[in-house]
Amino acid sequence: MKILIISNHAYPAQGPRAFRTTELSEQLARMGHEVVLYTVLGKYDYAQYEKETGIQMRDIKPRFATSANDGTQRYNLFDKFMFHYFHRLLMWPQCEFHFIMDRIIKENPNMDVLITIAYPHSIHSGAARAKKKYPEIFPKTWICDCGDPFMLNPFFHSPKYMKRYEDMWCSMCDYIAVPTKESYKGYYQQYWKKIKVIPQGFDFSKTPVAEYKKNDVPTFLFMGSIYPGVRDPHSFMDYLLKFDKPYKFIMMMRTPLEERYVKESNGQIEYITGKGRKDVVWECSKADFLINVKNPSSVQTPSKLIDYGIAGRPVLDVENDFPDPTSFLKFYEGDYSGEHKIDFLDNYRIEHVAQQFLDLV
């Protein structure tokens, strides 16, 4: 089959949507399908990557300040002005994708399958716009893949007028792929019949783990994104500053939190930034246990739980306000009986995930 995939980010970019795009594209190509992947390439040389994977890499070519796979991003005075005043109102600069999809569909007529991957959701709405304009050349089956909801996202409130764009792509696509059963709640009920649960997929063979050895000092690790007041470890970290026993708490993220935690803990709290997913999982597998700051929303499940499952170390759930240290103290002493069980890890194998997409065609 000829498969067209459109996503903001892919290899070598880091992040859940980049991983989703990369793993899915590579697996579909391994299965013998012709895969054309449009993403924001930047200046990265994909010649060797195309040769190794068989994927045809194409550039979305946005004109404005959307970040590229290689981490580059135009951000001049005009971009700063537009982002400051119009990011919330227009979803600037990602709104540009809405108008680029026409060209991509015209460049790739009569494909068997189209998979559009959000964030941003303007990729979906742009594809809907292209389907209206060019129905005769539009791909036979269209799957909208959504890691997070849009209009009903509890973490981000979009302008009400954008509901018309969500209605447009939800009504025109064939399927909406979401990562968990709970994700249904992030979409308007009239579209639930289109929703298919397809979890995040990973090639486990590319993710080595260490042979665990108990650390001299109890060592626990957190990885992932932080949303102040929502998915927020500050209360837990404040507790650690007063904890009078030796420990090592490693936080792996894109950007560090306040340096005061490092200083006031005498280095017992440590930040590690800029590591790729493979390195992060390796570090997780060496920790005594892992910290999961619980997500108060049931419509979003942190993809880091999959990485935690691959790492194979016990997982401690921590509330935002950290009201009771009892569970932490048990983990500290090596009692992991209350761990967060990550079951059915095989469901996340990319071979199974890619087949679930193909089963929709």
Please describe what each predicted stretch is:
Residues 1-61, 109, 175, 240-244:
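N-terminal subdomain of nucleotide-sugar transferases
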Residues 23-24, 122-125, 132-133, 144, ...:
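Membrane-proximal helix-turn-helix segments that form the acceptor-binding/catalytic region
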Residues 138-143, 150-168, 204, 230:
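Nucleotide-sugar donor phosphate/pyrophosphate-binding loop at the beta->alpha transition
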Residues 169-195:
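A short, active-site helix/loop in glycosyltransferases that binds the activated sugar's phosphate group
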Residues 182, 200-201:
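Carbohydrate-associated surface elements
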Residues 213-230, 237, 353:
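Conserved donor-binding/catalytic core segment of Leloir-type glycosyltransferases
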Residues 253, 258-281:
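Nucleotide-activated donor-binding/catalytic signature segment of Leloir-type glycosyltransferases, i.e.
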Residues 330-361:
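A charged, aromatic-enriched C-terminal amphipathic alpha-helix characteristic of glycosyltransferases
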